[in-house]
């Protein structure tokens, strides 16, 4: 079962830590966001394989935007 990882805030993508196909654990950092001069890590809610990464460095994302899919 796939799990969508979505943005909780409006932010810029500072760093994409994972790539499609990566094996990750629960709590691993997927991407780093920047908002209001603060770095905010987006963590995996489940362990699995990253099946899709929907953002790139420099993207401005809105709350609810898809960041990645873990399967």
UniProtKB/Swiss-Prot annotation:
<dbReference type="InterPro" id="IPR050709">
    <property type="entry name" value="Biotin_Carboxyl_Carrier/Decarb"/>
</dbReference>
<dbReference type="InterPro" id="IPR000089">
    <property type="entry name" value="Biotin_lipoyl"/>
</dbReference>
<keyword id="KW-0092">Biotin</keyword>
<protein>
    <recommendedName>
        <fullName>Biotinylated protein TB7.3 homolog</fullName>
    </recommendedName>
</protein>
<feature type="domain" description="Biotinyl-binding">
    <location>
        <begin position="2"/>
        <end position="71"/>
    </location>
</feature>
<feature type="modified residue" description="N6-biotinyllysine">
    <location>
        <position position="37"/>
    </location>
</feature>
<dbReference type="Pfam" id="PF00364">
    <property type="entry name" value="Biotin_lipoyl"/>
</dbReference>
<dbReference type="InterPro" id="IPR011053">
    <property type="entry name" value="Single_hybrid_motif"/>
</dbReference>
């Amino acid at each position: 079962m796939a799990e969508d990882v979505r943005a909780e805030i409006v932010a810029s993508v500072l760093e994409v830590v994972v790539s499609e196909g990566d094996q990750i654990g629960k709590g691993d950092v997927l991407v780093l966001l920047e908002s209001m001069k603060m770095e905010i890590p987006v963590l995996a809610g489940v362990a699995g394989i990253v099946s899709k990464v929907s953002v790139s460095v420099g993207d401005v994302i809105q709350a609810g935007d898809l960041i990645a899919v873990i399967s």
